[in-house]
Curated annotation (Swiss-Prot):
Keywords: Antibiotic biosynthesis. It comes from the Eukaryota. Pathway: Secondary metabolite biosynthesis. The keyword Nuclease does not apply. Residues 307-333, 425-449, 489-556, 571-602 are annotated as: Disordered. One of its GO terms (biological process) is antibiotic biosynthetic process. Disulfide bonds: none annotated. Induction: Expression is positively regulated by the KK-1 cluster-specific transcription factor kk1F. Part of the gene cluster that mediates the biosynthesis of KK-1, a novel cyclic depsipeptide with 10 residues which is a promising active compound with high activity against many plant pathogens, especially Botrytis cinerea. The role of kk1D in KK-1 biosynthesis has still to be determined. Disruption phenotype: Abolishes completely the production of KK-1. Residues 440-449, 500-527 have a biased composition (Basic and acidic residues). Residues 318-329, 428-439, 572-590 have a biased composition (Polar residues). This is KK-1 biosynthesis cluster protein D.
Length: 996
């Protein structure tokens, strides 16, 4: 009887009326239809009732086939792929009609149809409430498809949520218990994640891992039971021990945060320690160094706190506001004024480097806690600092939030060590230089650097001390706050226990907090009293070692994460500040020794980027040295080691130095790489300068930051769902064809997980033969007339080639623009540009180019014999590219190069010729035609028409050097014609050996 009522209700409803309805109305109707099925399916008590319910909904879908092909596709798995297929007669025909309708819906490739299919399928299985609660309706299509596949395999929400919980707890355990910094805690989202809803703790990796498990174990009762047990805790410990709980739909979430409406928890032991989420990648653009280096500094946090408190003061009452008396209001006003002053100071920090190079950015003038004990008179008792403690507590909370948002800090420790070494080396060289002014400048820089770092550490140490005093709830009378200069209550130099503990980081933070006793808190208070009653900076310096000797190490380990980050940030800034000072200092004679040159100059932006990559490449070389499963794998791994180990970073000539750092080469001629901004490159190009070295161009793009690897992979699937893609394996060096569906699924998993040298990563290491699909803005150098020669000739011969069946690398027009998509630890093998010069722009991620340019005849003979297996034998030089960097390999520069990928990277580039280097281009093409047998037939096929067009172009007096004297121009023209004829003869002879 109940089933008949449901049948009548569904039949009489107008959810999917056959009348014309708009697309949004159709989507809403489809969602309601799926929700209705979920509700009715839950009331079925037997298989027979469910079978009858399936027929009811099948008939309803068939009655509105004009509008419901998408719904049929979504319900194909929900109603069961084999449901009723064994029936005879009319029922069998009805199921056949339903299958055909569903297939028609599956063939719809537009985004709207596919979103509708997957959303309806998920809601029909799990219901609409959890789907809307977690905001899954805004998931990108590839991830939504994977959630739908999971719902098909695990149709019960109770089972599905346990499976997702078990996957989330695995990564949470890796981070909290095993210290894996790449793993995300539950509730954290990576920068590249598309699951950003505040109530959804799942990441793409959780969904993919759950889907992989379901495909293998969905029918195993024992496996499901094991999953339920794993979802109850970590290593047998309940989840609430780690600051986790279950939300209203059974999902494991943090017990405090956006998942808790109250947002308040006084039990600090239940909350896991907070540290920065894993960064997608580091951006060290030289255009805005200070804005990058200071986002987590204390002044920035206080400025943020200023903005936050202004907006919330009227609506949110402080938790302990009843403890504040009216007499403390002046102190709060003073604290607010101090925060406002530091907000202005922070805005100056965010100015361009050249505008603030002469400004003092020392953090010694920052008042801790909005003007608390640091601004009191010597006779004032610090235990009455309640209002300021309230502010410092908020600042401490804000520090943790900013730590989670700040991603570009991983290289600070390396740069800090380099900066100390540079200062010491500079001091040791002062006697040889004999310049008093240089000596005084270096002394000031060293003194400022030490004070700034020491001040930063003491500021954070005092924050913790004041919080401890607040815990003691001390009550004493206040005196008027001093209007004098801020005093910092301790200096912890590089040799003190505080600094050594800060170097070790925050790994002992939890243990130190548990070990903190009331007696130690009293000692902290005494140390702060001693520092707070100090009148002069000299007394501060004398008191600091004594105050910090007993408690410094413990305090620094407790606040290690905050102190280390602040020191790293300010140390990095100090390096940039010294680079600015060097531009006005007297010129120092450069030594021919590269090591001495490095000690005399501040690191360039490229060298800072290289410092970050050093650790990554070292780890890669260690892994490669252990790969010896087969001879091919061992040989290919050795080839990568020949390029990477030992690391030989290119010497860089930088111009202009004041903008991008300092040159690391003795001269422009001896440099391996040039690094220029666009204006400087443009000046060289306008003067018809022939570039003899690769050039890294720093240029600003309007579309900067608009390209991401995962979005590009999604675009590939949308455009070419039924095609195959050629990919190269970085372990074996071999290439194979993969279906686009398999490639995109694996690539998205790799992008989210951040894995390297795993089976998944190596299988999709390099996507080759990609034409220009990103359509990013090209660098401005391609707009210069002298670099448009190849595109001009290609346009002249367009339509005369007569073939289209070539692979993309052999297609002339495809060489004018191409994309390169690589994943972690991808290696491209050794190769030379087929058509001369090239440019590549890094759209997303990081890339290392290894270039061997200064080669002799023996090296080129080996390359002709070995091809992509050629080893540089120590002649390769490395250069790192970050987002928006452009690498220009000049036409006519004969060089062999390979590329490595530290993290997923998307690049776009193209080939070009230079009108100022036509003789060199012809020589390069002649060498390739003689030695590259694998490209002879397609090379001859394309160059035969291209050379004719070039000769005609030269006869029209289009050569850029036509202003030369007549006799010189005639000689150049005859030389070019002779080279063209030699190339034509070579191609004709080899074409006879390789007939079509």
């Amino acid at each position: 009887m109940a089933l008949q009522e449901r049948r009548a209700a569904v039949t009489s409803s107008d959810i999917l009326s056959a009348h014309a309805i708009s697309s949004p109305a159709l989507a809403a109707a489809a969602i309601n239809f799926a929700a209705s099925f979920h509700r009715d399916a839950r009331t079925c008590c037997s298989a027979h009732e469910r079978s009858q319910l399936q027929k009811v909904y099948r008939d309803k879908i068939l009655a509105n086939d004009k509008f419901t092909a998408n719904i049929a596709a979504a319900f194909l798995s929900v109603l069961g792929p084999n449901a009723g297929r064994n029936d005879a007669g009319a029922e069998r025909e009805r199921w056949g009609d339903f299958d055909r309708l569903a297939q028609r819906g599956k063939n719809m490739r537009d985004r709207e149809s596919q979103h509708l299919q997957h959303q309806s399928g998920i809601i029909a299985a799990w219901g609409p409430r959890c789907f809307e609660y977690y905001g899954w309706h805004v998931l990108p299509l590839p991830l939504l498809r994977q959630v739908h596949d999971l719902a098909v395999l695990i149709p019960s929400w109770d089972d599905a949520v346990e499976l997702l919980n078990s996957r989330m707890l695995l990564r949470h355990e890796l981070r909290v218990l095993h210290g894996n910094n790449k793993a995300l805690r539950i509730g954290e989202h990576s920068a590249a994640s598309k699951v950003q809803d505040s109530r959804s703790p799942v990441e793409r990796t959780d969904i993919v891992a759950a889907l992989d498990w379901a495909r293998a174990n969905a029918t195993s009762a024992a496996a499901r039971q094991a999953v339920k047990e794993a979802a109850q805790g970590m290593n047998g410990t309940p989840i609430n021990t780690f600051g986790l709980k279950r939300d209203c739909y059974g999902m494991v979430v943090p017990s405090v945060g956006p998942y808790d409406p109250d947002g308040d928890d006084d039990n600090d032991e239940d909350v896991v320690d907070v540290s920065p989420r894993p960064a997608k990648h580091i951006k060290l653009s030289a255009a805005e160094p200070l804005r990058l280096m200071f986002p987590g500094s204390l002044s920035h946090v206080q400025a943020c706190q200023r903005h936050d408190t202004d907006g919330e003061k009227a609506s949110t009452a402080p938790i302990r506001s009843n403890k504040l008396s009216q007499s403390k209001q002046p102190e709060l006003d003073t604290a607010a004024e101090s925060l406002r002053t530091r907000h202005i100071h922070n805005e100056r920090i965010n100015e361009p480097l050249d505008e603030v190079s002469d400004c003092s950015l020392s953090l010694q003038t920052i008042a801790v806690g909005g003007g608390s004990a640091q601004e009191e008179t010597p006779d004032q008792d610090v235990e009455h600092a309640h209002p300021e403690v309230e502010i410092t507590s908020a600042i401490s909370s804000e520090l943790r939030k900013v730590d989670e948002r700040t991603d570009g800090i991983r290289i600070g420790r390396v740069i800090m060590r380099r900066s100390h070494c540079m200062v010491r080396e500079q001091d040791n060289q002062t006697n040889e230089e004999g310049t008093g002014e240089v000596q005084s400048q270096r002394d000031r820089r060293a003194r400022d650097l030490g004070k700034d770092m020491e001040t930063d550490m003491d500021i954070d140490s005092q924050l913790e001390e004041m919080l401890d005093i607040h815990a003691l709830e001390a009550q004493r009378n206040h005196e008027e706050m001093s209007d004098g200069e801020d005093v910092v209550a301790g200096v912890a130099g590089p040799g003190t226990p505080t600094h050594r503990a800060a170097e070790e980081g925050g790994c002992r933070e939890k243990e130190a907090e548990n070990a903190k006793t009331d007696e130690e808190q009293v000692q902290d208070k005494a140390a702060l009293d001693q520092a707070g009653n100090t009148n002069t900076n000299r007394e501060v310096e004398n008191a600091a070692p004594k105050a910090h000797s007993q408690e410094g190490a413990l305090r620094a380990s407790r606040t290690g994460t905050i102190v280390e980050r602040t020191v790293e940030l300010h140390s990095t800034h100090s390096i940039h500040q010294r680079a600015s000072v060097n531009t006005t200092a007297p010129t120092v004679a450069r030594s021919s020794d590269s090591d001495d040159s490095d000690s005399l100059h501040s690191p360039t932006a490229l060298q800072n980027l290289q410092a970050y990559i050093d650790t990554r490449t070292h780890q890669l070389t260690q892994v490669l040295s252990q790969l010896n499963s087969t001879p091919d794998v061992r040989h290919h791994a050795q080839l990568q080691l020949d390029w990477l180990s030992p690391q030989r970073w290119a010497s860089v000539y930088v111009e202009p130095e004041h903008h991008m750092g300092a040159t690391s080469s003795a001269s422009s001629d001896s440099a391996d790489i040039w690094c220029l901004d666009w204006d400087t490159f443009h000046q060289y190009a306008d003067s018809n300068h022939v570039f003899r070295r690769p050039v890294v161009i720093k240029q600003k793009f309007q579309d900067s930051g608009m390209y991401e690897v995962d979005r590009y992979v999604d675009m590939l699937w949308q455009r070419f769902p039924e095609q195959h893609i050629e990919v190269q394996n970085s372990i074996t060096g071999t290439s194979r064809l993969m279906s686009m569906a398999e490639y995109c699924s694996t690539a998205l998993t790799v992008t989210e997980a951040g894995t390297s040298l795993s089976d998944n990563t190596t299988s999709v290491s390099n996507a080759v033969n990609l034409r220009c699909l990103a359509r990013a803005d090209e660098p401005l150098l391609t707009r210069l007339e002298r670099f448009q020669l190849l595109s001009t000739l290609a346009s002249r011969v367009a339509g005369t080639i007569g073939r289209t069946e070539h692979s993309p690398p052999s297609n002339l027009e495809s060489l004018l623009g191409f994309d390169a998509l690589s994943f972690a630890d991808a290696f491209s093998s050794s190769h030379a540009n087929l058509f001369g010069g090239s440019w590549v722009r890094c759209l997303d991620g990081l890339k290392i180019y290894a270039i061997a340019a200064d080669l002799d005849a023996e090296d080129w003979r080996r390359f002709a014999d070995e091809g992509y297996k050629w080893s540089p034998r120590g002649k390769g030089r490395l250069i790192a590219l970050e987002e928006d960097d452009v690498l220009f390999i000049p036409p006519g520069l004969r060089a062999i190069h390979a590329s490595f990928t530290p993290e997923p990277c998307l690049m776009e580039g193209g080939m070009l010729w230079d009108e100022c280097a036509i003789p060199e281009i012809l020589d390069e093409l002649l060498w390739i035609a003689r030695h590259q047998a694998g490209t002879v037939q397609p090379l001859e096929f394309q160059l035969s028409s291209l050379i004719d067009a070039l000769e005609q172009w030269l006869n029209e007096n289009n050569h850029i050097n036509q202003s030369s004297p007549s006799h010189t121009a005639a000689e150049e023209r005859q030389t070019l014609k002779a080279s063209i004829q030699s190339l034509r003869d070579c191609l004709s002879g080899r074409s006879a050996a390789f007939p079509s």
